[in-house]
Amino acid sequence: MDLEAKVKKMGLGHEQGFGAPCLKCKEKCEGFELHFWRKICRNCKCGQEEHDVLLSNEEDRKVGKLFEDTKYTTLIAKLKSDGIPMYKRNVMILTNPVAAKKNISINTVTYEWAPPVQNQALARQYMQMLPKEKQPVAGSEGAQYRKKQLAKQLPAHDQDPSKCHELSPKEVKEMEQFVKKYKSEALGVGDVKLPREMNAQGPNRMCIPGGDRSTTSAVGAMEDKSAEHKTTQYSCYCCKLSMKEGDPAIYAERAGYDKLWHPACFVCSTCHELLVDMIYFWKNDKLYCGRHYCDSEKPRCAGCDELIFSNEYTQAENQNWHLKHFCCFDCDNILAGEIYVMVNDKPVCKPCYVKNHAVVCQGCHNAIDPEVQRVTYNNFSWHASTECFLCSCCSKCLIGQKFMPVEGMVFCSVECKKMMS
């Protein structure tokens, strides 16, 4: 790819979602504007997933690329125009008759994703076993949750070097090898089955979602109400409770045929969020989402959110950073050798701290320098000096003395307090 094409691609990436409102900050954010190298909005500092950005095609491309060159090619399709793999997510539309006074109307519910099984009754019951706020019904809180988890759990920059910032040729090669390795050793997609079906599942049968799907014989089991409350020989690998015979369970091939999960228990062992679209990574007998699997293998830069493939990086405040990304969160000035203050787990240089974050002294009404001693009570602060921490009535210095606080004022005695009331 020549320089002009690279610049154009970079520009398109930064134009994506431009101006989209922030769902978290509301009117406080002027609209989404991607930071040059951080994966956040320049205006409000929230991530792209917190903004109302339409990303359906982009997310399908990302997941499609993840499944490329794996056994899960049945879940992708390549566009004839550019050959880019696209994720063929299973969309489920349910129609429910609703009785009205004069006639019957039809209520349609669209799930933006559903497990790719032929038996729709099984897929429907799977959805009902998820918390309502996490069911991906189009236009709902659950659909927004799925969108957010797709961005959080499966970052494009964890699999595609072109989505990363200024990797060297050596780093690109190392990343490609890393991605190839986790695709072959850890990546998997859960499959929905009835526990009774596992008896017929042998170790020589591979179950690929979208390929070997549940058969229509499962319909009878779904409709057998007497079976719904019977327990089985299987227990959930997560919560350890028994599986009910008529309830769907999730099976993960890499975990083995002896492990099953309740739909709501198929979660990442680190963040404990539902594994989006049942996409998992298996390591040391644990389920991980893509992000936390990669975190267990490589250091991640707290500045740009990318995995670090360089041998040289810095560690500060129990986090890892590319050398060039240990910068002030407000102004982006490099902090190596400089005084900084951590604000919400983000490093901020001294000038920006004083300007944007420092508490104001109740005595002199000036910002309190981060290196200066202070006195704090509830939400109020004072310079720990004879000029500032004084009785609000008689101006007696209160350092080392007992005092009586009243909102933003302090008093040395009951008498002084009464005089000011």
From Swiss-Prot:
Subcellular location(s) per record: Cytoplasm; Cell junction, Focal adhesion
A molecular function (GO) term: zinc ion binding
BP term (GO), one: negative regulation of cell population proliferation
Domain notes: The N-terminal and the C-terminal halves of the protein can associate with each other, thereby hindering interactions with ZYX.
Domain LIM zinc-binding: start-end pairs: 234-297, 299-359, 362-421
Region annotation (Disordered) ranges: 133-164
Domain of life: Eukaryota
InterPro entries, A to Z: LIM1_Testin, LIM2_Testin, LIM3_Testin, PET_domain, PET_testin, Pk/Esn/Tes, Znf_LIM
A Pfam family of this chain: LIM
Stated family: Belongs to the prickle / espinas / testin family.
UniProt keyword list: Cell junction, Cytoplasm, LIM domain, Metal-binding, Repeat, Zinc
Listed name of the protein: Testin
Source species: Sus scrofa (Pig)
Assembly mode: Interacts via LIM domain 1 with ZYX. Interacts (via LIM domain 3) with ENAH and VASP. Interacts with ALKBH4, talin, actin, alpha-actinin, GRIP1 and PXN. Interacts (via LIM domain 2) with ACTL7A (via N-terminus). Heterodimer with ACTL7A; the heterodimer interacts with ENAH to form a heterotrimer.
Record function comment: Scaffold protein that may play a role in cell adhesion, cell spreading and in the reorganization of the actin cytoskeleton. Plays a role in the regulation of cell proliferation. May act as a tumor suppressor.
Domain PET, chain residue ranges per copy: 92-199
Entry annotated with the keyword Cytoplasm: yes
PROSITE patterns per the UniProt record, alphabetical: LIM_DOMAIN_1, LIM_DOMAIN_2, PET
Entry GO terms, CC: cytoplasm; cytosol; focal adhesion; plasma membrane; protein-containing complex
Glycoprotein found in the keyword field: no
Basic and acidic residues bias spans: 155-164
